[in-house]
Structures are given as structure tokens and as C-alpha cells.
């Protein structure tokens, strides 16, 4: 492979770390010029098994260089949120990327992306950006889409991988790419969970020991809801609420059933059940796929034979994952922590 001489040094089969956007653009442009595909995994660092799964999925693509960005984006944190406290573990994260065989890490500082005077132009996420997470965190999705758009413009990847745990984020990023005619395929990857079903999140580190034990109730409630899909939307919500009602110490911010595009849920077909809750001072979100109405009936007509069937976009050819009857999210074909 011949890289132009004015391009920053890039060594194959090693982790190459770049801070400046201009350096990353030159390197990825040169790689594309010699026929390589680029896959981007955007992160805020504090890498865990969920991030590792995104990277593994990206690495399965043939003829592809995997780039991982690590940037705690101030634009997506509101007043009183945990921007200052958000875990920053860059040295550990870079060691993790090296172990996984990642070849390009982009680790900008805030000034590198937004300049000395800050960013003047941001993206409007539209009406969906004010619902669900957007209602609880005003401005969050505008800040998120702005940094993702910048990363896509800097790296210009053929693919970008996002976890389904942040499902509303995934939907909005896909919509942005479509609306703005960006030439990147957005790939959603199923949530990685602990053995008790809790979705992996960097914010899990904030949980007290007692709250950590309670937190698994969120995934249990989602699973109970998904299993009621054959009986319709009301039954899904009632089943989930019944499970949560036994745990009044968990403060529910929202529990909603939506379509896969986060519009209204269909009477029959694929939907998404989403939850946000506080345990102590820690805020957690989660979601699960749901099949509603006749779509939830197995080929033999039994209730819930496919409850929680995965419908994620998979560039690696693995296809969807189907859940067994009675499955909780930890059993629904999701990736397990490794």
C-alpha cells in the first residue's frame, strides 16, 4: 500500500493515534485512495464490552480499516448533567483498542473540533429530538448530531457503528445521514448485557452496590412487556408497568412503546419499548424490540414465540436474532458481556 508522502504516518497492523482532524482526514483519504474501506466507531471513551462488540462487528468487514473516535462531547450535556464527572480513561481505552487490533484512534480535544470560540452552527434534530430523551435532556440530540456530523465529515467512513442501547440516537443518526445525503451506512448493533440483563453503560459505574442489584429490573420489565406483544400495545405497557410497580424505589421518567422509527406503534408488526429511570442519582436508559399483534404469533400460533425479535441493520451477514418465548432482554439474542 502506497500512502502519499504528505500524509501523516500510518502503520498497518498497529494502533495509530491522531488528535488533529486534518491529520485524520488526510490518512483516511489516503486509505480510501488505495482501495480501503473505513469503518468508524464513535465513542466517548470509558470503553466496555458494548464498545468492544461494536469494534468486533466493524472488524468483520473485509478490506476495512477500523477507526475509533474518543471524545466526550460537551454539546450533548445539559446544565447540571455529568459532563465533568463523566469517566475519562484514555490510556486504558487506547490499550483496549490495541488489544482489539484497531488501527486508527481519533482523540481530539474540544478545541480541535469546535475551535477557540466554540461552534456557531449546530444541527436541529427535528420534532423527534424533543421527545423521549429529548424531553428529559433539552439540547442533547442537537449536540449529539452536530458532533456525529463532524466526525463523519472528518473521517468520511463507508460505515459507522452505533449500539442499539441508545436507540433514539441511532434513529436520529440514520435520519440525519438520509436527510443530508451523507455517504455513510449506519449500522445498529444489539445491546450488550450483563448476565442479569442490565444493559452495559459507562454510567453503570455510578451505581451503588444496592442500586446495581435493583437495576436489572429495567430489563426484566422490558422483557415482560415484549412477551405480551401478541395481546397488543396496551398489554405490553401493562405488563412492563406491573413489574416496575413492585420497585417504587426506581423512579421512572418514561416508559413508551413506539414504532421502530419512533413514530406511533403499529397495531401489528415491529415496535420498540423504551424506558428511562433513575436509581439514586444515576439515570439509566434501555429498550427492547417488540412484535405486536399477529406478528408476535409463532408459526404454530402460540403466543409470543418470537417476542423481542431483533430487526437491527447488520452489515456483517449475521442476520436477525430471535428470542425464545418468555425471554427477557438478556435472552433475546442480545450479545452477552465478555
Regions found by a protein language model. Give the residues of each.
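Short beta-strand elements
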Residues: 274-279, 288-291
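Basic, glycine-rich polyanion-binding accessory segments appended to enzymes
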Residues: 261
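Ordered hydrophobic segments in well-structured contexts
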Residues: 38, 272-274
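Asp/Glu-rich intrinsically disordered low-complexity tracts
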Residues: 299-324, 329
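Nucleotidyltransferase catalytic core that binds NTPs
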Residues: 2-249, 257-258, 281, 288, ...
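A short, glycine/Asx- and small/polar-enriched loop/turn
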Residues: 266-271
Amino acid at each position: 500500500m502506497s500512502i502519499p508522502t504528505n500524509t501523516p504516518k500510518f502503520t498497518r497492523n498497529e494502533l495509530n493515534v491522531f488528535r488533529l482532524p486534518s491529520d485524520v482526514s488526510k490518512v483516511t483519504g489516503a486509505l480510501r485512495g488505495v482501495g480501503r474501506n473505513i469503518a468508524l466507531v464513535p465513542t466517548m471513551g470509558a470503553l466496555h464490552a458494548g464498545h468492544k462488540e461494536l469494534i468486533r462487528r466493524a472488524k468483520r468487514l473485509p478490506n476495512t480499516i477500523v477507526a475509533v473516535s474518543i471524545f466526550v462531547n460537551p454539546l450533548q450535556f445539559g446544565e447540571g448533567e455529568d459532563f465533568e464527572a463523566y469517566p475519562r480513561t484514555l490510556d486504558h481505552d487506547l490499550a483496549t483498542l490495541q488489544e482489539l487490533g484497531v488501527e486508527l484512534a481519533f482523540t481530539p480535544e474540544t478545541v480541535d473540533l469546535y475551535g477557540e470560540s466554540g461552534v456557531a452552527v449546530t444541527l436541529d434534530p427535528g420534532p423527534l429530538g424533543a421527545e423521549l430523551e429529548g424531553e428529559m435532556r433539552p439540547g442533547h440530540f442537537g449536540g449529539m448530531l452536530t458532533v456525529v456530523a463532524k466526525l463523519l465529515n472528518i473521517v468520511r467512513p463507508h460505515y459507522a457503528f452505533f449500539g442499539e442501547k441508545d436507540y433514539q440516537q441511532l434513529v436520529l443518526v440514520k435520519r440525519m445521514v438520509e436527510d443530508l445525503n451523507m455517504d455513510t451506512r449506519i449500522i445498529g448493533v444489539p445491546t450488550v448485557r450483563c448476565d442479569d440483563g442490565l444493559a452495559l453503560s459507562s454510567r453503570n459505574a455510578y451505581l451503588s452496590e444496592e442500586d446495581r442489584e435493583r437495576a436489572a429490573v429495567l430489563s426484566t420489565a422490558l422483557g415482560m412487556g415484549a412477551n405480551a406483544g401478541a395481546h397488543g400495545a396496551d398489554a405490553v405497557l401493562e405488563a412492563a408497568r406491573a413489574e416496575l410497580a413492585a420497585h417504587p424505589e426506581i423512579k421512572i421518567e418514561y416508559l413508551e412503546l413506539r414504532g421502530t422509527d419512533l413514530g406511533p406503534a403499529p397495531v401489528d408488526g415491529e415496535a420498540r419499548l423504551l424506558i428511562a429511570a433513575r436509581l439514586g442519582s444515576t439515570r439509566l436508559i434501555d429498550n427492547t424490540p417488540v412484535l405486536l399483534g399477529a406478528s408476535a404469533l409463532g408459526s404454530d400460533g402460540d403466543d409470543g414465540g418470537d417476542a423481542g425479535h431483533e430487526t437491527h441493520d447488520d452489515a456483517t451477514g449475521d442476520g436477525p436474532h430471535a428470542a425464545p418465548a418468555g425471554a427477557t432482554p438478556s435472552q433475546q439474542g442480545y450479545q452477552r458481556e465478555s
